[in-house]
Amino acid sequence: EQGRLITPTLIKYADRVDYFAGASTIQLDQARRYRFPDEEPAADAVSGASAPEVKLVHWDRKGEEKLAAALLYRHSNLSYDDVWERVIDLGPGSRQAIIDESTAGLGAHDAPTREFEVVDYTFEFTLDYGAYREFKRHRMMSYLPQPLTVAHGYKIPPVVVQAGLESEFEQTVRPAEDVYWKVREVSPLAAQYLVTHAHNRRVVTKFNLRESYHLFKMRTSEEAHFSIREPMLEAMRLAVGVQPQFFRNLKLRNYPDWWPHP
């Protein structure tokens, strides 16, 4: 109440919003009603040093046409429909030339123009919670995380593996998991506080081509933390695999062995 007296304009809209307060409950009810299980214990709760789980679930199959149209639209006096029809008639060779010319001058710290935001990628990541907290700092994207849980196992840091301390690491994590399941029977929300940063969290995220340049440059370098570097390398491999032509002029600090461009 004192806040309302001192800074009334800052907290003018701080009242409870019933729609947002009830949205999560409605979604949980829908999942259960249509028999989508909300949680099951993992059969093997140790993910160890395995490869990150990354899936490219959707990508823009008209991306080349959309990007070329966006690049030509800005300084044209034609409607978008007219630009689109002409871009289709240009053929793939001309469209690729337009894209290449638009990225040829990119420096190591430059971002592509806004036109590159018209192409989207949707990924599903299974990241350890520490990596997830780093990942969500990138704001030019949408992300939909599932609740924190121990059901997807945990990531053992490579340095722990190299030191031969896997057993000690597991012995440290297991009690937290045991208590998690007990607390969850009483309060699923409270149980989430028992999830360690090593435990995996599943998230679906969508980001555009422009953001992918920034994300891949920053998070695939050798200086990046391993827990986010590995999944970002895999995400980049998947994106480049379906649309290599978009990444021809992407400037990386460290190129992976599979990089398709000279």
Outline where the language-model segments fall.
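A conserved ligand/cofactor-binding region detector
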Residues: 1-262
